[in-house]
């Protein structure tokens, strides 16, 4: 482990750094313009990431992104069987997400998400906060589980939600103007407050 390492790590274009532990690069910032691969990693990644490269979660990785990644404009890739979780907007920065695994968003605050989220993976909403999606952030095709708080659609025109299955759990809420592509299951205690669904 490099837990005491506290210097900047720079990943150049066409270069790759592969980690099998969240403390593999210590506590320092990561300037990623290449490829940072998390391979069979579990735990909290507290490093702050910047740059325009790719962060790839592979081989059953399950990582919580805790760093201030506000300056990261690259891409998070979540492979099948892997998972990333975030709590705040700064954890995703301005990056896009290709999600073929599981993305968990646990927020206690309101968050208007403008990130592009695509892929066949699932999204789980936890926490009491309101997560507002647009067409780009609602482009993923996997299952949506609203376990806590609310997923809202704030546009005057209907947002196209590509998710094939939507589960609104007890205390979960879905609201706004939305056109859905798949089936919807509102469980006891869940609430659906939408202007339009198909």
Where do the PLM segments sit?
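Residue-level recognition of the GNAT/N-acetyltransferase active site
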Residues: 58
């Amino acid at each position: 482990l490099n837990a005491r390492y506290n210097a900047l790590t720079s990943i150049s274009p066409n270069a790759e750094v592969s980690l099998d532990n969240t403390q593999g690069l210590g506590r320092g910032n990561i300037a990623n313009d290449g490829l940072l691969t998390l391979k069979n990693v579990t735990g909290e990644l507290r490093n702050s990431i910047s740059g325009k490269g790719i962060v790839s979660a592979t081989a059953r990785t399950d990582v919580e992104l805790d760093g201030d990644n506000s300056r990261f404009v690259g891409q998070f890739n979540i492979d099948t069987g892997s998972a990333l979780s975030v709590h705040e907007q700064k954890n995703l920065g301005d990056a896009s997400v290709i999600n073929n695994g599981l993305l968990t968003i646990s927020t206690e605050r309101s968050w208007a998400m403008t990130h592009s989220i695509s892929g066949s993976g699932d999204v789980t909403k936890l926490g009491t906060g309101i997560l507002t999606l647009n067409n780009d952030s609602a482009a993923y095709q996997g299952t949506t589980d609203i376990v806590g708080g609310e997923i809202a659609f704030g546009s005057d025109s209907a947002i196209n939600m590509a998710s094939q299955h939507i589960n609104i759990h007890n205390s979960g809420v879905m609201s706004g103007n939305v056109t859905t592509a798949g089936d919807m299951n509102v469980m006891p205690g869940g609430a659906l407050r939408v202007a339009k669904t198909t």
